[in-house]
């Protein structure tokens, strides 16, 4: 309980920084779990610290800000004007918009960001999206709608990203696994930009 009070106090003082730290940490935990539970290579058995760092960077510097903004938009802009804002029909609307707009676009964005941070080409990002987008989206739809219905109904706005991030430890484990799965399967070479002297 004390930890929650510290989190709330920090969220009031520095909301963006707090969300960035929390989201990055939980993305990192997801990647650590993925590497320990689902090692992707029988040849390279070492732990990939850079991969975890990429997950933390994505969570902290990219997703935390997008997620925070997205939940504010869902809360403040997405509702039927003729119903009370917290009516069950508005919760259904928010879940539908979240799952039919944000999720289908967020997954390719994730795979693209990770490819770029891995130093790989856009062709690799396209390959990841081609092979992983639909199965990952189907899994997303099996996991997130029920949770988001609860999240939008019960959890206060300022804690929604935290609630998502806690549940997302498992989701991030899965995403990290899916992201690395394409790379192992295809052994796509890393393309670094040419050095200009």
From Swiss-Prot:
Its main location: mitochondrion. GO terms for cellular component: cytoplasm; mitochondrial inner membrane; mitochondrion. The chain crosses the membrane at residues 20-40, 55-75, 97-117, 137-157. Pfam families: Mpv17_PMP22. One of its GO terms (biological process) is ethanol metabolic process. InterPro entries: Mpv17_PMP22. It is a multi-pass membrane protein. May be involved in cellular response to stress. Required to maintain mitochondrial DNA (mtDNA) integrity and stability. Required for ethanol metabolism and tolerance during heat shock. Belongs to the peroxisomal membrane protein PXMP2/4 family. Present with 1870 molecules/cell in log phase SD medium. This is Protein SYM1.
